[in-house]
């Protein structure tokens, strides 16, 4: 760790984090604390259909609120622009995102575009001009994207058959609520896809050349939680402890992204998903083990360090054996959770 001591680092994370069963009740206090009079809620029809937005709507009834629930699964530039135009000049004091990565990304984009003198297309050219316009609360309903912790938002660009990230620290949410009740009934298929996405976050962040002692701390702890709990959460719908660990692991992965960024898996995943319209977690899963194997010689020391953190019982193994073990575990997790491994 000596190399870290001689460098300086910055890590920006959400300033208010509520975690644990029924932590969504804290939304009442947030609304009061921020003196909120009007709220814009982003979600999707699936989340509303299964009742995951009911509690949020009940709490929001104490003030004026509007719900946007017709976002596409992988929002394109035109989708986000449509929503921004629909909202128009209406003033909101708070934006709440209730859903997976796409919903939260759209929420974060709205928080920096509504009321601003620049557009989404301006941000695609230069995201450094962004400024927070409206405070945000992120309430994830999956255990994988980590969007509730990041300064990133991804939009699809169909004409280029790709996706692009907008990155600016002003998009980091002001409040995060990690309530396991929100993922208690999450289908195994979604646990698998979003969980492997979270696993890619922590592994890529830890092996990134931009890794720091701060991002490492979150990436290692996130890796421990995800490697040890993703199969449990996938196989046992009643294992709320495993799901809570997955939710926290995904959040840690998001924090790690802010500190070091992802690497080749995600870089290849965006055009794959953009061209073939594959869910983000699935496109990562298709590539994950193969990319890590291809790059192993350049990051095997870091993979071995990660293995030491996640599987301390393998401490006597060689660096190569530890690196191989992590890569094999990645492949086995994808197989064990029945994620497609080809187009």
Please describe what each predicted stretch is.
Residues 24-27, 49-52, 77, 102-107, ...:
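Short glycine/serine/threonine-rich phosphate/pyrophosphate-binding segments
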